[in-house]
């Protein structure tokens, strides 16, 4: 199911901002013990704020994507496996983001963090696959 260009590019932009700020935060977090750790810590804080804001916008886009794209494609039996993988990665990211933000458990936090990072990286790899598979089936 092809999306209107403005909506499609909004989704691409939102996912790009999420991936870049998430990856940037990861680098900044790893560097906070360095000699200029304070700079990295401040950078990590700013990146996390942008990441959270982009996540809010992405949630709105995903909410619109369900009836406009996912449900229509599902009913037409198009790209079901690839779309299900996309939905699963997004659901894992939403649940783990909620856990990271709202759960105070120091036992669960490292697990949530690593699952969130892994799901984000895997989604970034799978997203272009989903697009290519969908376009091949439209031809």
Model-derived regions, located:
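Membrane-embedded alpha-helical bundles that constitute the cytochrome b-like, heme-associated redox core
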Residues: 1-139
């Amino acid at each position: 199911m092809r999306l209107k260009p403005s909506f499609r590019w909004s989704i691409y932009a939102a996912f790009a901002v999420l991936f870049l700020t998430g990856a940037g935060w990861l680098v900044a977090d790893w560097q906070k013990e360095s000699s200029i750790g304070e700079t990295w810590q401040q950078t990590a804080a700013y990146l996390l704020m942008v990441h959270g804001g982009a996540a809010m916008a992405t949630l709105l886009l995903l909410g619109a994507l369900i009836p406009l794209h996912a449900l229509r494609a599902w009913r037409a039996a198009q790209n079901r496996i690839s779309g299900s993988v996309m939905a699963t990665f997004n659901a894992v990211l939403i649940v783990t983001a909620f856990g990271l933000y709202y759960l105070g458990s120091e036992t669960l936090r490292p697990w949530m963090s690593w699952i969130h990072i892994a799901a984000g990286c895997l989604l970034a790899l799978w997203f272009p696959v989903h697009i290519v598979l969908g376009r091949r089936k439209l031809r």
